[in-house]
Amino acid sequence: MELQTKSPTTQNDFSQHTPMMRQYLRIKAEYPDLLVFYRMGDFYELFYDDAKKAAKLLNITLTARGQSAGHAIPMAGVPYHAVENYLTKLVRLGESVVICEQIGDPATSKGPVAREVTRIITPGTVSDEALLDEHRDNTLMVIHQEKDRFGIATLDITSGRFLIQEIISENALFAEIERIRPAELLISEENSVHPLKADSIKRRPPWEFDHATALTLLCQQFQTKSLDGFGITHLPLAITAAGCLLQYVNYTQKSALPHIHSIQAEQNEEALFIDANTRRNLELITNLQGEEVHSLAWLLDHTATPMGSRLLRRWINRPLRDQILLQQRQNAVSTLLEKRNYSEIYENLRHIGDLERIVARIALRSARPRDLMQLRQALGVLPTLHQQLTNLPLNKQLQEIKNNLGLFDELFRLLQKAIIENPPIVIRDGGVIADGYDAPLDELRNMSTNSHQFLIDLEQQERERTKINTVKVGYNRIHGYYIEISRAQAKQAPTEYIRRQTLKNVERYITPELKIFEDKVLSSRSRALAREKELYEQLLDTLIEKLIPLQQCASAIANLDVLNTLAERADTLNFNAPQFCDYPIIKIEAGRHPIVENVMTDPFMPNDTHLDEKRRMLIITGPNMGGKSTYMRQTALITLLAYIGSFVPAKNAQLGPIDRIFTRIGAADDLASGRSTFMVEMTETAAILHNATEESLVLMDEVGRGTSTFDGLSLAYACASYLATKLKAFALFATHYFELTALASTLQAVKNVHLDAVEHEEKIIFLHALREGPANKSYGLQVAQLAGIPRSVIQHARQKLEELENPVISETQQPQQNELFLPIENPVLTQLDKLNPDNLTPKQALDILYQLIQLRQQK
């Protein structure tokens, strides 16, 4: 039979369906864009388009149920006990899911079992441990655009961290998206911004982006009359975005959000600006293949707690400019390193677990029994951590951590008394609350588990009380509990005995006491479970009262974990403390690339870097594979490590104020956007030339290589000149255009360096050592030979190279200048030598470029 292709939810015609399907369709109509998991017995079922989509995404069977307008209804399902695995996959694919549970009893329901939506799971609002990556913040982002300005609001519902900011360019917006990497991104249906890259993008109606509504919602959430106390009133676009975000979270959670009790503005000037391209090139969180291995986070993350791991990534992603705060971090690392007690602190921290997310689940009332067990274990560790910090000479950073750790002795004792040692995963089936915690619960449990002993005791009690030796207490399924007396002694039955059944030889009775017991026993299990759930909710109420100090404790532990990890990494990897200066300088002695050094088997060759007010740019030459890119990246990584408060892989390092780090290293076609490799390269270069300042660190590798020799050389020359003379940024400029080394003779702030190599028996040996002055040879053929180019091709190339370097003019041939290897007298280069880059604007540089092209064509 043909499957139905159009869902009746789009037709609003439910009349041809069964009552159960009508119930489903009414619910589905409220959530047209979400997958509805509809509980039916032991399965969650999906219908129509939801079924088709789920079958494809989850690789489950697509079947059919009943008919709709003569067509079979598509259906797919998953077992209820395995639903979390399927939800995890869907969320990671960017899908959102509605969970519709049975809340009625099928045995007593007249018509369809009552059902209601109990959970809405979206990628950015999920809080279940099984659905989350413990190393990554799970952030919901909202962007509100007005003309060329953007308001941004972000919330990590698993921590309560609520942040806003405003941005004035698309480039900065894309940099923030790359930094935050939201799990879910909301934008207005009217948003005109360039296509965004995020895991899950949803468009919201324009009326959700209303400033007045946002103010009202935020004040209600924070229980304030205004937002003045948060210092955000100067950010109207961001406030509007925050209002949309709060509406969405309220819609998905169907519960209060007590752990979201504050909002904070992120100031862009507080942090180093790192654009999306630079973030990828430096491999901060993932490598160039998108994997975490061999990234900076991979190297540094030896944290003991998941929340410490996430905080470390936030530090890496957002280096600070405040040298005072950075010095405090560095001093804390020094203290932990000097005392060599980071191992003991680590051992205690690893017992704490993901306290940050546990506290959030408590606030959302979705905490499971094992969350409370882990919380109890964490609270039990705090006194030891307090003592370990007390034994240290505490600087401001460590003192704040100790103060915020807190001691929760009362909560610890409560959880110790209330929760069994190893509780089940869920409260649903009971067995979570410890014996002895609650007398009514103990009584209900005793009735359920010790009813046989009660009957024995009651029988003995009644025999003694009535003096009737044939008294028996029993039970059957029809009549329930009874007291049995032989017919011969029935006349001696006490007056409070109520006849329940007469048999041939015995009479059976019930007493008020036995009736009460019967009612209790028959309902004791369900009542015990209900009582457990009631007590569990009371525990959550008690914990929610301590929500803010528990959040502060979790934050303090995360900070301690990161600082402790940086101390361990410094010791293990031989990092040293950098020195911060208030004047322009980047001076690194024996610097090393932290990741390359860690993964290579041979000893790493350390190199110096020296940039200051009079030495702004290094033109770096040398062979391919000689280490130019590694050298540039290590300089940037050392700078970045210092600006997160870490020690650095160098013997010594002096660093002045840095506001931005830019890289232009490598490029590939952007086929999706229709951009060639050269266009990508020029776009990245333009972004640097427009945004770099004299406090920026700029890495540029092989600018101009994607076009013809003259175009590329001219562009590289003009860009290097502009960086050195107009922007005066700290720049490492790697090139194979040896003509660029002439800049050092005309511009005082430009110096030449090269990565050394030697040739032996037509083979190249890379020394990877930085030397002053330009390289004298490119070693291109030797590198090609190393790459496996056939020997015959290499020999042919050598012959051609000799011809080009030493041209022989035949008698019948007019002398011709080879286009690829012009002598220095070439008019194009002569014209370049006459230029004064100090007086060039970008427009003038472009005009000169066209003149040079014309000159070349005329020749």
UniProtKB/Swiss-Prot annotation:
Record's keyword terms, sorted: ATP-binding, DNA damage, DNA repair, DNA-binding, Nucleotide-binding
Binding site residues for ATP: 622-629
Entry's Gene Ontology cellular component terms: cytosol
Domain of life: Bacteria
Pfam family, one: MutS_V
Family assignment from sequence similarity: Belongs to the DNA mismatch repair MutS family.
Function text: This protein is involved in the repair of mismatches in DNA. It is possible that it carries out the mismatch recognition step. This protein has a weak ATPase activity.
Protein name, entry field: DNA mismatch repair protein MutS
Gene: mutS
